[in-house]
Amino acid sequence: MAKEKFVKTKPHVNIGTIGHVDHGKTTLTAAITAVLAEKGYAEKRDYDQIDNAPEERERGITIATSHVEYETDKRHYAHVDCPGHADYVKNMITGAAQMDGAILVVSAADGPMPQTREHILLARQVGVPYIVVFLNKEDMVDDPELLELVEMEVRELLNEYDFPGDDVPVIAGSALKALEEAKEGKLGEWSEKILKLMEAVDEYIPTPERDIDKPFLMPIEDVFSISGRGTVVTGRIERGVVKVGDEIEIVGLRPTQKTTVTGVEMFRKELDQGEAGDNVGVLLRGTKKEEVERGQVLAQPGTITPHTKFEAEIYVLTKEEGGRHTPFFSGYRPQFYVRTTDVTGTITLPEGVEMVMPGDNVKINAELIAPIALEEGTRFAIREGGRTVGAGVVSKIIE
């Protein structure tokens, strides 16, 4: 009997596997699909299919990522897994794969390793809100006290980076053993542990708020003046809904102004409202063409504010990716391309960091020469004369 097609009626959640190299992230991804396939909830994907991830380009950066889909009783999941550590760094910073939560894989035989720490830090910096832990290779640990010790270490590490380490679900198991069971078509004790992990993911990682339910935000791409009607700004609505009659704010580059939406149109047709994902023209009451420009945003009043100083996590492109050939130092002044425009800014490196090499990722402080609508989680590119040399995400607003 053919397995039924995915029905998109269940709530959708994006997750991914993170953790140290060789702790079993890809094996776990394969095991989840294999075990759920036995229940008719997934198409089985072999380790090799997942590990030979196709390369994608996101803002000119080459990232190898595997995407798998599966379901549980409650939800539909899109799951990302990356073959190499550098791919994780790029993925998380560019937001190429937005994660609503992550499964942190830690080998019970080895305990937390350097990349375990680095991935937790990245998750904190780029705003991955929830982590569930899978202690893998449980079959290789004979002493139950050792398992408890590793669990304590992982919980302490999560606490260190402001995750609720004491409340995070920790499930022990063996991805390889579960995979072997599923291959033989019989789900035993190891497969049960995978199902238990997915139950924890179902329960602990909340369903994210949909873009359309968030407060309205639209980056301005273009401004036109239509005689007899006023000023129209165009752009793609990033989130929320805009209706005729709504009061909105124009934020960034200049003092914030309030205005009222007198029309919304798409493909030259009048609409009552535009929503997240729509490319629209928005007619603004009493706003002159000179008063608005590309790089500003339209937003629900009070939901986003202009800033010049922030902390960010950035990835610097390699020479092969078309980036710089040389390092840069504190005081470096590139352009920050935020949504639709470039703004010059100065980068200050953390104490003890002398310089940043192409291929590095680093936490920086930035100060822009003009205020831009920013919030934690805003993504940007770093450019020099129109060429992308880095990518980043705002981790904290300073002023």
Swiss-Prot record:
It catalyses: GTP + H2O = GDP + phosphate + H(+). Residues 19-26 are annotated as: G1. Residues 60-64 are annotated as: G2. Its EC number is 3.6.5.3. Disulfide bonds: none annotated. Keywords: Cytoplasm, Elongation factor, GTP-binding, Hydrolase, Magnesium, Metal-binding, Nucleotide-binding, Protein biosynthesis. Pfam families: GTP_EFTU, GTP_EFTU_D2, GTP_EFTU_D3. Residues 81-84 are annotated as: G3. Signal peptide: none annotated. Mg(2+) binds at T26. Belongs to the TRAFAC class translation factor GTPase superfamily. Classic translation factor GTPase family. EF-Tu/EF-1A subfamily. HAMAP family: EF_Tu_B. Monomer. This is Elongation factor Tu.
